[in-house]
A protein has these predicted regions:
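A compositional/structural signature for long, glycine/proline-rich flexible linkers
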Residues: 1-266
């Protein structure tokens, strides 16, 4: 029998919450890096404002450290989307037989769809990416993709057949378009928006960022299971004051010793 059952339980829950919340928090942090601190587009770093395509103009080398093991035979195009206000529309030009793929990741970093030569062929197309709960009609000629979360990360890759082929890929990148549904008729771009600092510091910043992100996300099966656990704990500990959701957070200092931090969540 442990001497501190409540503390040990809270610690165990904290560890599980950290593991489960890791992709959400890291994705949020990565989005802040990906969205530049100004409205400028920085192609060689694949950074730019929200709801904007940013295209690399040179093949990446090992010096590029924002992504592990980047391709050297494709040019990248990326975008961070916020679909809470309205859908975003992307235009894919006729690829004329060239390899391409657009990878769509939700806020949990799950790949929920691909737009590629395998799934769509090479023809020109226009696609509306809709957030959860959007039920409005779309203009004629728009294919609909429903995103499971209100934030989405797109990673596009266009095949390049050596350095001499780069200008041809630049031309395709210039034909790509991304903008709000409300501006689709006149191809209006989104108003430039940059990432806001998280505002969370200190040893509990990870958990605070995770809770903030989860407030905007629809429930997944894993999250639903955690909510059931949370209700159970609240019932069991209701007569003992605030719930010790994370009583002990463990991290090691430079000497390798363990320090504990208490957080009370009512």
């Amino acid at each position: 029998m442990t001497e501190h059952p409540r503390e040990d339980l809270a610690y165990a829950i904290g560890v599980q919450a950290y593991i489960w919340g890791y992709p959400v928090v890291i994705n949020e942090r990565r989005s802040r890096i990906g969205m530049a601190s100004s409205t400028d587009i920085i192609p060689h770093m694949l950074r730019g404002p929200l709801n904007t395509f940013v295209s690399a103009k040179e093949l990446l080398t090992p010096d590029f450290e924002d992504v592990q093991s980047p391709n050297n035979d494709t040019l990248y195009t990326t975008a961070w989307l916020d679909l809470r206000d309205e859908p975003m529309v992307m235009h894919v030009p006729d690829m004329a037989g060239r390899y391409y793929t657009y990878q769509f990741l939700d806020a949990y970093t799950n790949n929920f769809t691909y737009v590629s030569q395998r799934t769509r062929g090479f023809q020109e197309m226009n696609i509306a990416i809709c957030g959860p709960g959007h039920s409005g009609a779309l203009p004629s000629g728009l294919e609909r993709i429903d995103a499971p979360t209100p934030t989405v990360f797109i990673i596009g890759r266009l095949g390049v057949d050596g350095p001499d082929d780069v200008p041809a890929v630049h031309a395709l990148q210039d034909e790509m378009f991304l903008g709000p549904l409300s501006g689709w008729a006149d191809r209006r771009l989104a108003e430039p928006r940059v990432a806001e600092p998280s505002g969370h510091t200190g040893p509990l910043a990870f958990f605070e960022e995770g809770l903030e992100a989860l407030r905007t996300l629809p429930a997944s099966e894993a999250r639903a299971a955690l909510e059931v656990l949370g209700r159970y704990l609240k019932e069991r500990l209701a007569d003992r004051g605030p719930i010790l959701l994370i009583h002990h957070m463990v991290h090691r200092d430079n000497e390798g010793s363990v320090r504990r931090h208490e957080a009370l969540v009512s």
